[in-house]
Curated annotation (Swiss-Prot):
Comprises two domains: an N-terminal domain containing the nucleotidyltransferase activity and a C-terminal HD domain associated with both phosphodiesterase and phosphatase activities. It catalyses: a tRNA precursor + 2 CTP + ATP = a tRNA with a 3' CCA end + 3 diphosphate; a tRNA with a 3' CCA end + 2 CTP + ATP = a tRNA with a 3' CCACCA end + 3 diphosphate. One of its GO terms (molecular function) is tRNA binding. Catalyzes the addition and repair of the essential 3'-terminal CCA sequence in tRNAs without using a nucleic acid template. Adds these three nucleotides in the order of C, C, and A to the tRNA nucleotide-73, using CTP and ATP as substrates and producing inorganic pyrophosphate. tRNA 3'-terminal CCA addition is required both for tRNA processing and repair. Also involved in tRNA surveillance by mediating tandem CCA addition to generate a CCACCA at the 3' terminus of unstable tRNAs. While stable tRNAs receive only 3'-terminal CCA, unstable tRNAs are marked with CCACCA and rapidly degraded. InterPro entries: CCA_bact, HD/PDEase_dom, HD_domain, NT_sf, PolA_pol_head_dom, PolyA_RNA-bd, tRNA_CCA-adding_enzyme. A single active site specifically recognizes both ATP and CTP and is responsible for their addition. This is Multifunctional CCA protein. Magnesium is required for nucleotidyltransferase activity. Nickel for phosphatase activity. The lineage of its organism: Bacteria, Pseudomonadati, Pseudomonadota, Gammaproteobacteria, Alteromonadales. It comes from the Bacteria. It holds the Pfam family PolyA_pol_RNAbd. Belongs to the tRNA nucleotidyltransferase/poly(A) polymerase family. Bacterial CCA-adding enzyme type 1 subfamily. Keywords: ATP-binding, Hydrolase, Magnesium, Metal-binding, Multifunctional enzyme, Nickel, Nucleotide-binding, Nucleotidyltransferase, RNA repair, RNA-binding, Transferase, tRNA processing.
């Protein structure tokens, strides 16, 4: 019985990155032997055990055989006869197929160390193409290690392109697809994840709403990058540089989906694209089982980002309506999220990457002033029922008007 540290822990150690989780592989043992040693079995599809003291996972060495469609269509075979190399052969990338024994020696039958040094993401074997989830995993690794200079090996990209043309991707469950998206949104370069998927053809299959943005032009005056898909990737990158909130990053990703619905004869203009995108966002979120928190913010950003950009031109009454619609009174953190997404939208354009966004300070000041209206004092003054709401609303409009009057660059005009 031999125990090896495998997978991400070995890879990250070689990259001098923090090690989060440790996974172990056991060669030459039976489930009965593991149980006798005090390990607790938790794996249903294949033998995985928890260490009696550390609770870390120990999996028996196994092989896999493709028996059906999708990432779950595998038959696993675990036996004391399965060798270290046979187990490593079933793994996705060479950089994830390195093992370390208890003496600290590295076992690298598929040259993963050389690929780490060459910064290459390369598949271990042709069996890579049997698991469609690996297309998403490689895209995620490309995004995760983009800052370290990693690139996908040409032969691996060719395999991913072939896989994207088969029915395998459509066999992925929405939950597994979203799981990979969510992990990527939490990484340093989520835009790379989607760029890789587009490069291999998977974006069109899994995220047709996003893929449809590429090739849609925008006015060059405001968008020197012109292409809406390119702009979307730039906005996602900007949002990632400003916040780690995945909900904000998701909102940045989908804020312009409505532009794909603009009639070609109207290009490069996209009137009402924010509102046109709302049903598209709802449909995407429903299909992928996107959390409500992400969906609600994405809908708000799509619906209101044009108003936020034009904040200085809005009447005080319109600003209060925006605050009401977004329910900032009960969820003030949403204003910060909306503004972050709008800043990313403004800076996600060629030549505008470091542009100031005074609308943010202005709307924050408007909200702070409006939120200071004392509702309890209005109730104490004897107002009742619908009167309370009317008076509160009127007072809030007055407070915003005062901010507007003294704010440089804000138009004082209050008539429609």
């Amino acid at each position: 019985m031999k125990i090896y540290l495998v997978g991400g822990a070995v890879r990250d150690s070689l990259l001098n990155l923090p090690i989060k989780d440790k996974d172990f592989m056991v060669v030459g043992a039976t489930p009965e032997q593991m149980l006798q040693l005090g390990y607790r079995q938790v794996g249903k599809d294949f033998p995985v055990f928890l260490h009696p003291k550390t609770q870390q996972e120990y999996a028996l060495a196994r092989t896999e055989r493709k028996v059906g469609l999708g990432y779950g269509g595998f038959s696993c075979y675990a036996s004391p006869e399965v060798t270290l190399e046979q187990d490593l052969l079933r793994r996705d990338l060479t950089i994830n197929a390195i093992a370390q024994d208890e003496a600290g020696n590295l076992h690298d039958p598929f040259h993963g160390i050389a690929d780490i040094e060459a910064r290459q993401l390369r598949h271990v074997s042709a069996a890579f193409s049997e698991d469609p989830l690996r297309v998403l995993r490689v895209a995620r690794f490309a995004a995760r290690f983009h800052g370290l200079g990693f690139e996908i090996a040409p032969e691996t990209m060719a395999l991913m392109q072939h896989m994207s043309q088969t029915e395998e991707l459509t066999a992925l469950t929405p939950e597994r697809v979203w799981q990979e998206v969510d992990k990527s949104l939490g990484g340093p370069h989520p835009e790379v994840f989607f760029e890789v998927l587009r490069q291999c053809g998977a974006l069109k299959v899994l995220f047709p709403e996003i893929d449809a943005l590429f090739g849609v032009p925008q006015p060059e005056k405001w968008h020197p990058e012109i292409d809406t898909g390119l702009h979307t990737m730039m906005v996602l990158a900007q949002s990632s540089s400003m916040t780690e909130e995945k909900a904000v990053r998701f909102a940045a990703l989908v804020h312009d989906l409505g532009k794909a619905l603009s009639p070609k004869e109207h290009w490069p203009k996209h009137h009402g694209h924010g509102q046109k995108g709302l049903p598209v966002i709802k449909s995407l979120c429903e299909r992928l089982r996107v959390p409500n928190e992400y969906r609600d913010l994405a809908l708000l950003v799509s619906d209101q980002h044009q108003n936020v950009h034009q904040a200085f031109e809005l009447r005080s009454e319109t600003i209060i309506k925006l605050f009401d619609k977004a329910d900032f009174w009960r969820k003030p953190e949403r204003l910060k999220q909306l503004l972050l997404a709008c800043i990313a939208d403004m800076r996600g354009r060629t030549g505008f990457e470091h542009q100031p966004y005074p609308q943010s300070d202005y709307l924050n000041a408007c909200f702070l002033a409006a939120n200071n209206v004392d509702v309890k004092a209005i109730i104490a003054a004897g107002f009742q029922g619908a009167q309370i709401k009317e008076v509160v609303n009127s007072k809030r409009i007055e407070m915003v008007a005062q901010v507007k009057q003294h704010w440089p660059g804000a138009q004082a005009k209050e008539t429609p």
